[in-house]
Each structure stands twice: as structure tokens, then as C-alpha cells.
Swiss-Prot record:
Pfam families hit by this protein: Ribosomal_L21p
UniProt record, GO biological process: translation
Keywords: Ribonucleoprotein, Ribosomal protein, RNA-binding, rRNA-binding
Function according to Swiss-Prot or TrEMBL: This protein binds to 23S rRNA in the presence of protein L20.
Protein name stated in the entry: Large ribosomal subunit protein bL21
Domain of life of the organism encoding this protein: Bacteria
Tagged with keyword Ribosomal protein: yes
Gene Ontology, cellular component aspect: cytoplasm; ribonucleoprotein complex; ribosome
Family that this chain belongs to: Belongs to the bacterial ribosomal protein bL21 family.
GO molecular-function terms, A-Z: rRNA binding; structural constituent of ribosome
Lineage: Bacteria, Pseudomonadati, Pseudomonadota, Gammaproteobacteria, Alteromonadales
Assembly notes: Part of the 50S ribosomal subunit. Contacts protein L20.
Length: 103
């Protein structure tokens, strides 16, 4: 059984037991969180596609950790002007483990 749900403006395909990195969510580590924006639920031959959401669909997950991703380096450069600017960015994420998919 798998589901596609939406969180943080992105869609994620998950199954029970999967670990997924999502955009940062303000929930303490170890707590349970429910995602109700389920777009699709599939169980073998049975596939429920929402229009736009599956009625009564829920994905239940436990927060495993919070952290920051790899650094992305940004460099701005203006030719012939001795101007160079270098910046970095690390995006916050929340790692969750999927415990149940309800349809």
C-alpha cells in the first residue's frame, strides 16, 4: 500500500515504514503528525485518486529528527569590476517515519 500526499508545497510518494525528509514543520521530535492532504491511495489493484483530495484519506507519521541539508553555494560575479560575492544556504528539514496510511 502506498499514498501520495502534499506537504510544504511538494508531493511525496510513501509507503508504511518509509522515512521521508519534508520542509521544516514545527513539531517536537517523537510526536505524531497527521497529513490530511492525500492525493492518491493505492492498495494492490484498488487505486483511489482524489479530485483533488481523497475523502477521509490520512497519512500518519512520527517525527524522527530535525536538521539542515547540504550547503548550496551561490556565487555572484561582475566581469572586469573586481566584484565577487559568495554566499551559502542550508535548508531546514524535518525527517518523519510513516506509521500508517488510512483511506
Amino acid at each position: 500500500m502506498y499514498a501520495v500526499f502534499q506537504s510544504g508545497g511538494k508531493q511525496h510518494r510513501v509507503a508504511e515504514g518509509h522515512t521521508v525528509r519534508l520542509e521544516k514543520i514545527e513539531v517536537a521530535t517523537g510526536e505524531t503528525i497527521e497529513f490530511d492532504q492525500v492525493l492518491l491511495v493505492a492498495d494492490g489493484e484498488n487505486v483511489k485518486v482524489g479530485a483533488p483530495l481523497v475523502a477521509g484519506g490520512k497519512v500518519v507519521a512520527t517525527v524522527v529528527a530535525h536538521g539542515r541539508g547540504e550547503k548550496v553555494t551561490i556565487q555572484k560575479f561582475r566581469r572586469r569590476k573586481h566584484h565577487e560575492k559568495k554566499m551559502g544556504h542550508r535548508q531546514w528539514f524535518t525527517e518523519v517515519k510513516i506509521t500508517a496510511i488510512n483511506a
